[in-house]
């Protein structure tokens, strides 16, 4: 009986220590799709605007035509804009954890980091390579 209690206790501890991925795949797929659309608008605005953007948030606002409703699904997260010469990308982060990374120059959502071990919220894509 002592061994059974010990085994059950160990299993309980292991189950508690292994925290399941807290992100729902369906919700993350929806967010990735919306982020992809915004990233494409971001990239197009950067490439075809007469404005030389150095500030990511200004580029984001111009890309969504100041329609902040497009950002509502991301309210519990942080969106970071990456500008690398004539290319742009978006990072979706949960505090300092990178969830999704999307280069606006590609048709698909580029990196679904939320499925992997936690990564720091910083760009991992080399836009000069991805976008050429």
Where are these regions (language model features)?
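Bacterial signal peptide processing site
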Residues: 17-19
């Amino acid at each position: 009986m002592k061994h059974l209690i010990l085994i059950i206790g160990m299993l309980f501890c292991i189950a508690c220590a292994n925290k399941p991925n807290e992100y729902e795949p369906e919700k993350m797929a929806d967010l990735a799709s919306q982020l992809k659309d915004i990233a494409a608008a971001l990239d197009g605005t950067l490439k075809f605007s007469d404005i030389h953007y150095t500030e990511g948030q200004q580029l984001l606002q111009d890309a969504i035509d100041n329609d902040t409703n497009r950002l509502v699904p991301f309210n519990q997260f942080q969106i970071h804009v990456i500008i690398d010469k004539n290319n742009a990308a978006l990072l979706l982060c949960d505090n300092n954890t990178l969830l999704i990374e999307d280069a606006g120059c590609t048709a698909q959502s580029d990196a679904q980091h939320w499925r992997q071990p936690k990564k720091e919220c910083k760009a991992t894509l080399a836009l000069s390579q991805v976008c050429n």
